Amino acid sequence: LRSRRDQHHADADRLFRTALERRIPLFTTNLIIAETHRLTLHRAGVQSALKALDRIAASASVTIHFATADDHSAALRWLERLRPRPTTYADAVSFAVMESNSCNQVLSFDEDFVAAGFSLWRGR
């Protein structure tokens, strides 16, 4: 959703609006927030990066899960399980958190989630 030039912008916008309309609870991890901040900072600058953080924090629809030591241990197991696939630690923590919360769908375009056995939610 950061950039209208992103190949998935229109679909991401539609999916987020659909999730909000249906009152589907959304959650993410602080590591995904960190990745979002870094990408926005380097692509759009300080103001845009701060605005992105503010919008996420202000959203009543998004819960931020802060990674724990247990999440870290589970993420390491995910990285080992998915080897040799190049999976980021942030994604592995997401897998661990999704697994511990019995969440099998993700609003993402990242095929690493499919490789880990999760479904990409498409609003249906």
Question: Can you name each region flagged by the protein language model?
Answer:
Residues 95-96, 100-124:
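Acidic, PIN/NYN-like endoribonuclease modules and their adjacent C-terminal/linker elements
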Residues 1-28, 41-55, 124:
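Short, well-structured N-terminal submotif of metal-dependent ribonuclease cores
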Residues 22-23, 59-60, 116:
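Structured helix-beta-strand junction loops
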Residues 30-31, 91, 110-111:
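Short secondary-structure boundary segments
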Residues 38-41, 99:
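Short glycine/serine- and small hydrophobic-enriched flexible loop segments
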Residues 62-105:
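Active-site neighborhoods of divalent-metal-dependent phosphate/nucleic-acid chemistry enzymes
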Residues 34-36:
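A general alpha-helix detector
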